[in-house]
Amino acid sequence: MPHNRRNYNKTHSIALSGLLFALAMALSFIEGTLVIPGLLPGMKLGLANIVVMYALFFMGPKQALVLDVLKAFFVFLVSGWTAGFLSLCGGLLSLLVMWLLYYHCPLRPTWFILSVCGALAHNIGQLLGASVILSTAVSLYYAPIMLVLGLVMGM
């Protein structure tokens, strides 16, 4: 019986990972088609990142990392190299910050705090990625706006 239970858990995990990836792709695609007045060019709500956060909490860091990398690859296929790279940079830093806070902080922060910190880290990761692409720190002038909007989007 334990062998069958292990196979069930593995099958369940693979199926759930596939469903979460499909949901992340759908949300990413929908988010790319939305036109929200007042948002700066390239600014999105981060709906697909909610799926990665869910995976981190309920499936663990390994599955969340795989989902985050697959999501960035999807963005690369749909929107190009630059968008995929920025998605990867933001996603990895966001995941790292949420992982550190959730698994290594003695006082468990609330989901709200984790979401806000993850959104801020995502924007910082994207700004750092843009600095690498542009080979200059000029993109950091965008930081105050990105951080304020990241704070709002994380809520």
Question: Where are the regions a protein language model picked out?
Answer:
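Short helix-perturbing small/polar motifs within transmembrane alpha-helices
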Residues: 4, 15, 19-21, 26, ...
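Hydrophobic transmembrane alpha-helices of multi-pass small-molecule transporters
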Residues: 50-53, 72, 76, 95, ...
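Membrane-embedded alpha-helical hairpins and interfacial helices in multi-pass inner-membrane proteins
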Residues: 41, 84-88, 104-155
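Alpha-helical transmembrane segments and their lipid-water interface positions
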Residues: 35, 52, 67, 126-130
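Interfacial aromatic-anchored transmembrane helix boundaries in multi-pass membrane proteins
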Residues: 28-45, 69-98, 111, 133-138, ...
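Hydrophobic transmembrane alpha-helices
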Residues: 2-55
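Residue-level signature of transmembrane alpha-helical entry/exit and packing/kink sites
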Residues: 9-20, 45, 49, 64, ...
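Generic transmembrane alpha-helix motif of multi-pass integral membrane proteins
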Residues: 45-61, 97-102
